[in-house]
Amino acid sequence: MDFEAIKKAAQGYRADMSRFLRDMIAIPSESCEEEGVVMRIKAEMEKLGYDKVEIDKLGNVIGWMGTGDKIIAIDSHIDTVGIGNINNWEADPYKGYETEDIIYGRGGSDQEGGMASATYGVKIMKDLNLIPEGYKLMVVGSVQEEDCDGMCWQSIVNEYFNGPEDARSKIEFVISTEPTDGGIYRGHRGRMEIRVDMHGVSCHGSAPERGDNAIHKMAEVLLNVRDLNENDAGDDKEVKGLVKMLDPKYNPEHWEDARFLGRGTCTTSQIFYTSPSRCAVADSCSISIDRRMTAGETYQSCLKEIEDLPACKKYAKDVKVSMYMYDRPSWTGHVYETEAFFPTWINKETAPHVQALVDAHHALWGTERIGADEKAMSTRTGRPLTDKWTFSTNGVSIQGRYGIPCVGFGPGAESQAHAPNEITWKQDLVTCAALYAAVPGLYHPENKDGSATSFRQELTGNDIK
């Protein structure tokens, strides 16, 4: 493989990738509103000579290159979060701007930059005849990730393919182009969205003893939730902290993976109440909990932890603990209902699909993370090349739910995600496009031994019909 030719080709497309990314940034594309950016991506793929470009029923845009039966997929979510307070932005977040080195605007790092690199990385494969015999590339611009990570791939697996077994038999592995700060990422923590409902009885506020104040009871739950996140796991603690999963005593099978991924966390993210008036005792109170899960935790264990909090047991007859559902229509109007559960996943560093990216990076760019400038390198220097994300990605479904091998390498920085004045680096676009182009030829499926996955959370089995 001529790695210098790959680098030269990627550098030659630097201006095209930058223009393509600027065009995507200029089209507002929050979750469920991605139609405009989908059409822009479709047009770019068609211009570049993709063999087939299609839009599935959920609204994901899918480009194909090659004629083989085995699939290597590259995924980029093309929706973005909103801009938040416009006063926090130094320039128009959609009009954006560019310098010699950076591109500014919402979605640059998270993560339309990944779409630009993937689209052109596969074009380089075609230009240089790098697609191995028997393979084809599937480039996915996926929707609604910011709203419900992985739901787009649930739809792809179950509605585009004929279910998990069919998808697993056809897809060798998936590269996620989420930002990785120059690293190759082999997993991340999972998450779930938990709801706690507390029942009370209203009465006139002048005689509160006649009622049963749901807010007061929920206040005790809130303190317990804080304890669950902040406490250690000492025997003297009534509520043992989530840090316990880093200890082989509490997590004998997966404590090493948990230490790699980081401990689980929980925080109260929303609170709601009902009351007849401001002069009455509240008759209900509900909270949302953002729960991040590490290796060894399951959705059942996380729900039970909340149910077993002292305050929840104290008010057991008035408490309901549940998991949120997601059923928001996509930009096409299609609804794919699913639970707000996003499974943890990790690969072994020796897995052949991970090793293909490592080998490509070593051949193209060396053994260390690279970046265009001091700001980029501030989050890269000294970190291992192979690592993990802090946030969540579509990998929660690709590998977490369905066991399709997944690995990450993408332009930009995690710290830029959801932040005002978001930027990405043009050199990252080049770096990633070159690596994507090299990977298929360095993948050795004969090294698969069925043990790539270190940890993959079980499915819920919920009937959501």
Task: Give, region by region, the residue ranges found by the protein language model.
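Short, flexible, mixed-charge acidic loops at enzyme active sites
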Residues: G84-Y97, R189-E193, T332-E337
